[in-house]
Amino acid sequence: MEVSSVKKLEQLEYSLESVTDLSSSSVSSSSPAVATFSYVDGVTELRFLQSDSTHCFNFDLASAQLFKLGPVHFICVSDGSSSSEEKSFSKGVNIKFKNEKDSKDFCESFEEWRNDSVVQGSSLQNGTVSANKSKFDNKIEASSAKMYFHYYGQLLHQQNMLQDYVRTGTYYAAVMENHSDFAGRVVVDVGAGSGILSMFAAQAGAKHVYAVEASEMAEYARKLIAGNPLFADRITVIKGKVEDIELPEKADILISEPMGTLLVNERMLESYVIARDRFMTPKGKMFPTVGRIHMAPFSDEFLFIEMANKAMFWQQQNYYGVDLTPLYGSAHQGYFSQPVVDAFDPRLLVASPMFHMIDFTQMKEEDFYEIDIPLKFTASMCTRMHGLACWFDVLFDGSTVQRWLTTAPGAPTTHWYQIRCVLSQPIYVMAGQEITGRLHLIAHSAQSYTIDLTLSAKMWGPGASQGGILQSSTCKFDLKEPYYRMSQPQAYPVAQEPPLQPQPELSTQQDIQTPNDELEEELLQQLPQNPSAQL
């Protein structure tokens, strides 16, 4: 049997200037102490023993965290509960070294022993993954988490977000305009990424900022922060998930950019409220504070034809001798299960929008697992309704200034754009007609949501009071798999120039069937003669 890498490490001891319990109210002792790394009964431990006391502080390195407060001053914290239930408290000690060399050597040993501890405890004897997973790991599939953290661990994607000047500029303004909320306060940056929000908080006068980042971007954040010495000593980068890590103190302010497409995509809002419950003081503030999902029905004939024609490829009866039509229905359903991400003209909306509010200071993590939104609109025009358009905004409720960050159509475009759920069966509506429905979001383990959308046009005129339904259309969408249309032309070409070169012999009518021209002509005839009536 192979000897564990932990067992191969020799027991190490370090002489310390002093060690004191964080929870102790007594004056710190100046008596010397000894720190010992050891492997006991299958567990890697770090023990602190004061020379004038028999009391020993024991830490399981699998859950221990080390924080640097100065050249020779550190804090070590760890889970203080031995139960398998959710961690509810932590224990910690103040550590002071005799010199910087001792502190550096200790930190290197701490990382080496802790990493080996994680490797040793990651699998069971039969090779299966340990059941001792974090809350995040229990609800998110490993492949999705790996791709997610890989994506956000790359600088090019961080640059994409930093260059969203609406996003970055609004955060900067919200922090600086409310500097009194940050000055002298402890701040936690949830999902810190490059660390830009942590540096905003430090510029606003934060006493200390804990930048928590689970991806490899944490290393870039350390490098970037170190290159800005004006506030580098007030920012500590912690690599890990907020569900797993421990902090040496409570936070007065939480700051984060947890919003995804449709506000909730990527399910980071759950981590945001978990950080609130674990780290924030009862009277702390959250930046952002609330979010709103805005919704309105829309009419866009060009988009509908574009999506319908994508599936027409599968209508070919002689594609290199193969009949593709058996898959047409599945292809059509697949295209219309993709939410469309793009920027659209707000004049395409056929009713005034409504919104659903999410209060980050009050929402529980479980409240994000299923979100049910009843819909009710009044059509403002006679047209064909093609689906539901959605966008979001968030509020930074500072003590001095309340500032909104919006992704609304017609406003400056952000990297979130807007999202539209297109019905495979559009509905005709008349001006003044009531539109009802339901937007039902169910979270899944791929860090996204399944969307069930139903829209109905209620009877109008004399029978409206009876509440009868004239038409109804339902579609299911996967928010994880959108159709990114940002670079696509917003108008569908209604005619094409004849080809300059003759087509290959296979491209004859009997070989490759063209889209149903009669259907396309019928759809295009629905376009209003006066463009302003539609837009």
Curated annotation (Swiss-Prot):
Compartments, record wording: Nucleus; Cytoplasm
Biased composition (Polar residues): 507-516
Induction of its expression: Targeted by PQT3 to degradation via 26S proteasome. Induced by proteasome inhibitor MG132 treatment (at protein level).
Catalytic activity: L-arginyl-[protein] + 2 S-adenosyl-L-methionine = N(omega),N(omega)-dimethyl-L-arginyl-[protein] + 2 S-adenosyl-L-homocysteine + 2 H(+)
InterPro entries on file: Arg_MeTrfase (IPR025799), PRMT_dom (IPR055135), SAM-dependent_MTases_sf (IPR029063)
Binding site for S-adenosyl-L-methionine: Q158, R167, G191, E213, E243, S271
Predominant location: nucleus
Domain SAM-dependent MTase PRMT-type positions: 141-456
Record bears the keyword Mitochondrion: no
Observed phenotype of the null mutant: Increased sensitivity to paraquat-triggered oxidative stress. Slower root elongation after cadmium ion CdCl(2) treatment. Decreased histone H3 methylation (H3R17me2a) leading to reduced levels of APX1 and GPX1.
Residues annotated as the enzyme's active site: E257, E266
N-acetylmethionine: residues bearing it: M1
UniProt KW keywords: Acetylation, Activator, Chromatin regulator, Cytoplasm, Methyltransferase, Nucleus, S-adenosyl-L-methionine, Stress response, Transcription, Transcription regulation, Transferase, Ubl conjugation
Single GO molecular function: protein heterodimerization activity
GO biological process: epigenetic regulation of gene expression; peptidyl-arginine methylation, to asymmetrical-dimethyl arginine; positive regulation of DNA-templated transcription; positive regulation of response to oxidative stress; regulation of flower development; response to cadmium ion; response to salt stress; vegetative to reproductive phase transition of meristem
Post-translational modification: Ubiquitinated by PQT3.
One GO cellular component term: cytosol
Region (Disordered): 494-517
Pfam families hit by this protein: PH_PRMT_N (PF25350), PrmA (PF06325), PRMT_C (PF22528)
Quaternary structure annotation from Swiss-Prot or TrEMBL: Interacts with PQT3 in the nucleus.
Family designation: Belongs to the class I-like SAM-binding methyltransferase superfamily. Protein arginine N-methyltransferase family.
Entry function: Methylates (mono- and asymmetric dimethylation) the guanidino nitrogens of arginyl residues in several proteins involved in DNA packaging, transcription regulation, and mRNA stability. Recruited to promoters upon gene activation, methylates histone H3 and activates transcription via chromatin remodeling. Positive regulator in the oxidative stress tolerance that promotes the expression of enzymes preventing oxidative stress such as APX1 and GPX1 by histone methylation (H3R17me2a). Confers tolerance to cadmium CdCl(2) and salt NaCl stresses.
Protein name: Probable histone-arginine methyltransferase 1.3
